[in-house]
């Protein structure tokens, strides 16, 4: 699932893309990897680990944003790829981790 947000980095307006990659390695568990892009450029987040929960992936993006002067406009969210409905439900349930105060 790929989402885009309008936002700013150090006061400069730009579009940020979040690409969520979920890999079902077994029927009982999923692993998630998340990429943050500005344009076509992938930003290096703190870890490159595969997380066992989507919530942990989103927390990592939040911490990266906080330390790199990045803000997202939550109302500008746009899904730009095909997605499984369950992925959207799971993302909506966990996205509080991305928009902490």
Can you name each region flagged by the protein language model?
Residues 1-13, 72-75, 80:
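Negatively charged, low-complexity tracts enriched in Asp/Glu with abundant Ser/Thr
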Residues 14, 20-44:
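Short aromatic-glycine-(Arg/Gly/Cys) micro-motifs in beta-strand/loop hairpins
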Residues 39-101:
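Mixed-charge, Lys/Arg-enriched low-complexity segments
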């Amino acid at each position: 699932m790929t989402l885009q947000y309008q936002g700013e980095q150090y006061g400069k307006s730009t579009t940020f893309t979040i690409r969520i990659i979920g890999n079902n390695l077994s029927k009982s568990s999923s692993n998630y990897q998340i990429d943050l892009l500005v344009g076509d450029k992938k930003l290096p987040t703190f870890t490159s680990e595969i997380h066992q929960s989507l919530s942990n992936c989103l927390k990592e993006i939040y911490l990266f944003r906080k330390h790199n002067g990045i803000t997202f406009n939550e109302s500008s969210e746009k899904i730009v790829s095909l997605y499984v409905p369950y992925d959207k439900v799971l993302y909506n349930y966990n996205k509080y981790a991305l928009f902490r105060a």
